[in-house]
């Protein structure tokens, strides 16, 4: 970045920034059970060179759930951009939700991808499993803790993995996985679906997953559905 005064005289200021080694190509698909989805998400590049992907499912459906999940997502983004660490940021949001007079619960599914190293940090608070696809192999990221805003002493498990160009992260809310429980009892149909598909475009893949989940629900979603697909690519710029 260069900043120079107008005219022929003066001092120029230069700001040098290290180029990212990776970039994230993201596709999102949503389907609401009612008129307003209770799921909220955001994808943003932080000042420290990490890509923040956060998905939150407010308890219930409709406008109340949407308010809880949106507040969670917005506050997390603000705290991370201010420079807070993962544990402090999540515990701050947890405290804010617990201070509200009425019950305020929300899941947090969070991924931080280092655009220099390719390392991903996954934090899951009450959310359903996420999936990491590399070719025909699919890994599962899961946790068994309570949603945010339920207990004061919140456990924050963090899982780190190395990602390579072409790897795909798939994050979903429970409305996507739950219809498959009628098939396998666990709702992990998506793992097998991802292992079989060769689709690499995150936008098309997110639509395919939503359509499959809707078919499993026989055309009538029992809950809000959100799918985020994020592919890691080598930065050519």
Regions found by a protein language model. Name each.
Residues 7-58, 64, 71, 156-159:
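N-terminal entry segment of metal-dependent catalytic domains or homologous docking segments
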Residues 35-49, 105-108, 140-182, 217-222:
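Acidic loop->beta-strand submotif enriched in PP2C/PPM serine/threonine phosphatases
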Residues 17-40, 90, 94-98, 128-160, ...:
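PP2C/PPM family metal-dependent serine/threonine protein phosphatase catalytic domain
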Residues 1-10, 66-135, 210, 214-223, ...:
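Catalytic core of PPM/PP2C metal-dependent serine/threonine phosphatase domains
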Residues 48-49, 115-117, 235:
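Short strand-connecting beta-turns/loops that link adjacent beta-strands
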Residues 57, 127, 172-175, 224:
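DG-centered beta-turn motif at the end of beta-strands
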Residues 60-82, 152, 163, 167-219, ...:
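Active-site-proximal, acidic helix/loop segment immediately C-terminal to a metal-coordinating Asp/Glu
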Residues 17-18, 230-236:
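Short beta-strand-to-coil "C-cap" segments at the C-terminal boundary of structured domains/repeats
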């Amino acid at each position: 970045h260069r900043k120079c005064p107008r005219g022929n005289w003066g001092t120029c200021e230069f700001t040098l920034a290290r180029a990212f080694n990776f970039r994230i190509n993201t596709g999102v698909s949503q389907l609401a059970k009612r008129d307003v989805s209770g799921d909220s998400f955001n994808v943003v590049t932080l000042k420290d060179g990490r890509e923040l992907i956060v998905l939150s499912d407010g308890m219930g459906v409709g406008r109340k759930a949407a308010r809880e999940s949106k507040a969670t997502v917005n506050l997390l983004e603000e705290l991370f951009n201010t420079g807070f660490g993962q544990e402090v940021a999540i515990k701050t949001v947890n405290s804010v939700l617990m201070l509200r007079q009425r019950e305020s619960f929300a899941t947090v599914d969070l991924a931080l991808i280092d655009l220099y190293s390719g390392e991903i940090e996954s934090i899951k608070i009450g959310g359903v499993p996420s999936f990491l696809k590399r070719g025909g192999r699919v890994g599962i990221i899961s946790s068994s803790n309570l949603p945010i805003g339920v207990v004061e002493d919140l456990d924050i498990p963090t899982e780190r993995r190395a990602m390579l160009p072409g790897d795909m992260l798939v994050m979903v809310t429970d409305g996507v996985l739950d219809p498959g429980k009628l098939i396998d009892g666990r709702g992990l149909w998506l793992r097998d679906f991802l292992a079989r598909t060769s689709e690499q475009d995150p936008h098309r893949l997110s639509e395919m997953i939503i359509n499959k989940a809707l078919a499993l629900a026989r055309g009538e979603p029992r809950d809000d559905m959100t799918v985020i697909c994020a592919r890691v690519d080598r930065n050519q710029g």
